[in-house]
Structure formats: C-alpha cells, structure tokens
C-alpha cells in the first residue's frame, strides 16, 4: 500500500526499506533502541507491518506495527530523520499507519513515547491508558539493552 504527498511517499513494501539506515538511526539515535544490533532490527522488520517514508528513492522515516492482524497492535520504532523534521511528515506517517486497513480495525493499539504524546493524540487518536493499574510489563535484560534502575518507574526502583 502507498500514500503520496510529493515529493514524499509512504509505502508498506518491505523490499524498499533501507535496513541499514533504519539500523543506524535506531542504534545511534533512538533513545528506546540505542545499541540494538542489526540482527534484531532485521528480525523486528520481518515480524512487523512496516511503513517506510521516502523522498524519491531515499528513505527518511520509518514506523512499524507488531500485530496479530485481528485485535491488537503495538506501534513502535517511529522516526523521521532530523533533516526532514518540521515538515509535517511525522503527523502524516502516524495518520497513514492508523488508516491502514490492517490497523484501523484493531480493537487496541498501544505505543510508548516520552516526548510525542500530543502528536499521537492529535493525529493518531491515541490517549492515556484508561486503566493504567490493569497493565503490567516485564523488563528483560538483553545483551544490547541492560535494564537500569533509571529505566524503571519510580515506585519500582527500590525493588531492584
């Protein structure tokens, strides 16, 4: 599926993805994925519905949804390269992701963001969890991402 806004295009065609660029941005810049190895990036792409944002043939943004294609999705790894920010591309990317036929029918889509909640609220229809006390998460240390006490919510720091 493709969306066009000259000179930009958003595509779900995984063969167009510049996996090297995606890996470089996530590995070096994305606070949620710094240090993520190429092998993990490849595996996440293989197992997700991916959205590449391109200027001509050059990829300048990315997003993916981990989903069962029936009831649930997790939107993640959303970014626009710094040189293309301020042009409404993040807004457009979020709008396209939530409008995709395989996403818009899902009962629940989650995401996590420490700095773009307003964008996701306005352009994706997201809001804070209705019942945050019902949700749980599990942090797992991996070779590329060690859980630090600073990663945990304030109330959990004493339990580490």
PLM segments and residue spans:
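Short amphipathic alpha-helix that is part of the acyltransferase structural core
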Residues: 1-36, 147-160
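A conserved beta-strand-loop-helix scaffold within acyl/acetyltransferase catalytic domains
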Residues: 39-79
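Conserved acetyl-CoA pyrophosphate-binding loop and the N-cap/start of the following alpha-helix
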Residues: 84-93
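Conserved active-site alpha-helix within GNAT-family acetyltransferase domains
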Residues: 103-141
């Amino acid at each position: 599926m493709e969306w066009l806004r000259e000179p930009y295009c958003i595509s779900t065609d995984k063969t167009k993805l510049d996996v090297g660029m995606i890996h470089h941005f996530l590995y070096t810049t994305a606070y949620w994925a710094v240090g993520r190895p190429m092998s993990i990036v490849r595996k996440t792409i293989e197992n997700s519905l991916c959205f590449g944002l391109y200027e001509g043939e050059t990829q300048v943004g990315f997003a993916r949804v981990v989903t069962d294609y029936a009831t649930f999705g997790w939107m993640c790894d959303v970014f626009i390269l710094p040189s293309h920010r301020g042009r409404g591309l993040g807004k457009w990317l979020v709008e396209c992701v939530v409008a995709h036929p395989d996403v818009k029918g899902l009962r629940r889509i989650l995401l996590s963001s420490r700095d773009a909640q307003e964008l996701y609220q306005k352009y994706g229809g997201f809001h804070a969890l209705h019942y945050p006390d019902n949700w749980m998460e599990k942090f797992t240390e991996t070779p590329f991402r060690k859980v630090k006490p600073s990663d945990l919510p304030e109330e959990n720091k004493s339990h580490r």
